[in-house]
């Protein structure tokens, strides 16, 4: 009888320890505000404008769907007297739920970053594909700097074309058509997700946001999940405008992150098991073994800033998820709008994160292989070297800067994982011509997009540069500006450049002889030095 009592007591003790472990893990991932230890409402909470009812550092707390509350209580009332959140689901239960909702995604596995060994749970029968199909790791399609402009925002008149002529080569006149072609391509390729890394509208116009959301909803309804984060153009942008007649006019724009969330909550936010209370950052599970860490790097609380920064609270939040992902053998991919590294000799300000040092250190402390961004309007691939002389074979976080979709060659990225945790990335050009033929377009520019569009971009840039050159005959101006425009196009696209053919041109010789100290002369050198190789393919090193 005494032995039976001891056995019962032992069972209770084991049960208590298991429950305590689950509560501890959920407490790490759940409703505690990073760095405070206090429970906060789990929501798409974002800093409000300074002109609102909240002061600096204060945040609003919109209501959220239950689907976003898997890791936090979602309610202040759920906090118990001893500070423990009343959680109903364990982390393991969430993983199981992901597999049930995504049965084709297969089992959880992969290498622990920095550990170099398989996750012990990869052979757990509970995580195996219920359909007994061979597991295929996910593939995502990435688009940055979409700068969508609805045709309802302009009349194709004087004000509109002045904007196009003063811009950086965007084909805004075809924005609707390019979105149609992109949607058609997405549904043909059927990636695990379509990811938009910011600057999704021209200048944050509310109407452009709403029209874009409708288009994204159609893609998602057709079976491809859409995942979105903002860029610096998307929130609190007073350059928001319509273009009718001879002059542009101010247009309504989004004033806060909360308004962005209200429009786009169904594109990644609602599917997230955990959102950062201090920004629009969130975790998006592509499947149970692969997470996108969607980071809000934009500064829109007090007006609109071009430069980016990851909030300190967000870095703390990010660190928790990096640790948990490492412990569970989950592959992570951080994505933001602003650049992690110094990527350009030509664009040296307001591109790299203001707190890049802290962010790089955090990512590298968990051996994160890759970070993806946009913003620069030029494709770049670079690996961080902690100090000069570091071997090329040594670990360092790599960054891929996506080319701007809004500027020809209208490129997007395809990133895929393999079963060992490796990654492959490459850019592809949107096949505008094929889609134009498919829908019966009679527009010669669209039917010959691959040959017409480079000339369009170069023509825009050439005209802008020519206006800055004085005391030089027009034919020589055209020679000089034409060379710069040619290099600019290749720079944006990430196409290989070299000195030898450039130095042989009449245009370069004129720059050197007539305007050796001109900013464009310097930029020619900077562009060539930045892009010495084609920047369209990246593979994760096997050692990582």
PLM region descriptions:
Residues 97, 211-316, 393, 398, ...:
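Extended active-site neighborhood of metal-dependent phosphoesterases/phosphodiesterases
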Residues 147-178, 204, 244, 301-310, ...:
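Acidic/histidine-rich helix-loop elements
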Residues 187-193, 291-293, 305-398:
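His/acidic metal-ligating clusters that form di-metal
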